[in-house]
Amino acid sequence: MVKSVEDVALMGIRQDMVQAIWEQAKPHLEKALEHSDGEFKIDDVLQFLLDRAMQLWVLYDISTHDVVMAGCTEIVVHPNKKICRVVLMGGLSMDLWQSQTPVFEDWAREQGCVQMETLARKGLARKLTELDYKQIYQVCRKEI
């Protein structure tokens, strides 16, 4: 049973291993999708992972090896910089995930990224400021 940040580890999943861990990661990603605006369906996420358009990350319980959180990143290439965007994140307490952000950041640097970003609801945006994230934009949408 996960009780603290010492009980978990974050691991990036190689594209050729996505199918092997998918059933453990899928429920956490589906939970994250419940809070989205319908940009993706779970089958879309799997296809993006298999196509290497996104990367799968899992937070697992060190003692049981159970997946307790899952998330996806994507590399966004702009003309003047490369950014690693956290697209989805779902599972247990955000505090557990926050403790592992250096793993994401180190990997992103290795890919040539100079920034991390995520689209976040207000509550998560407040928590991310504790990790030196700055709110840059407000996203507004209208159905047409």
Regions found by a protein language model. Name each.
Residues 119, 134-144:
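Conserved catalytic-core motifs of GNAT/GCN5-like acyltransferases
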Residues 1-40:
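Short amphipathic alpha-helix that is part of the acyltransferase structural core
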Residues 51-94:
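Conserved donor-binding loop and adjoining core beta-sheet/short helix segment
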Residues 35-56:
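Active-site rim helix/loop that mediates acceptor-substrate recognition in acyltransferases
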Residues 54, 130-134:
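Short glycine-aromatic motifs
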Residues 46-47, 74-77, 106:
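Short, flexible, glycine/charge-rich loop motifs used to bind or transfer phosphoryl groups or to couple energy/partner
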